Amino acid sequence: HGRGADRREPLRAVPVFHEAGHSSLLISYRNDGVAPNSKDGRYALGDTEWEDVEASIRFALARGATQVVLMGWSMGGALALQLITRSPLAELVRGVILDSPVVDWIRVLDHQAGVLRIPGPIRTAAYQLIGSGWGSRFTGQSAAINLARLDFVARAAELAVPTLLMHSDADTFVPSAGSRALADLRPDIVTYVPFAGAGHTRLWNYDGKRWGQAISSWISELDGVTPPSSP
């Protein structure tokens, strides 16, 4: 789920996965209001929260799972991308589905700062605070956030997992430009499904049928199953 949401957000995907024969595990992560807080009680934009995704995979493995498909909304997408590039369990991830994801935090923060008319020098100073250990006295974070490590447009070449990426061009909170850039850089592994008119993480609300069909078709291809033809 995304920042500010909880594990109810992914409920909309459970029927699609169930129909495809997949079990679902809806997780919470630190500081989301359900899971225990971190020591500083601050979001790290995915730079640490991915460890909770890793813990959930271990939980699933202990109960019989052998492979995993990750799905993440918004910041949850950033967690999934960190997991597949940093965890020793990444080899068990068969695929990733991203709905309105943050694939580059600098791009998103720049956009939001622009909406708020925050001057460029102040933005730069804020990024330096977030990314440095000494900035913790101002940010309240217990550790620096590595914003470069969260940029998967720059790190596109490092990705190796089949990915379904869905984003709306009408998303005014996390613009689709980053997702489009990633898809353009990695057409070998990224299947990009654009939407128009949907707000942030509202693809299902806007066109649930198309959203569900995109996931079903992609999972069928991943599983090597011929999907049923649409009526």
Can you say where each PLM-predicted feature lies in the sequence?
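Short, surface-exposed "cap/lid" segments of acyl-processing enzymes
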Residues: H1-R30, V34-P36
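Short beta-strand/loop motif that positions the catalytic acidic residue
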Residues: E158-A160, L165-H167, D171
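Catalytic histidine-centered segment of alpha/beta-hydrolase-like enzymes
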Residues: A198-G212
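Hydrolase active-site cap/lid region
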Residues: R86-I145
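Short alpha-helix in the alpha/beta-hydrolase fold that links the catalytic acid
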Residues: V161, P175-D184
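Alpha/beta-hydrolase active-site loop
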Residues: R42-R63
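Gly/Ala-rich beta-loop-alpha elbow adjacent to hydrolase catalytic centers
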Residues: M71-G76, A80
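Acidic catalytic loop of the alpha/beta-hydrolase fold
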Residues: D169-V174, T201-R202
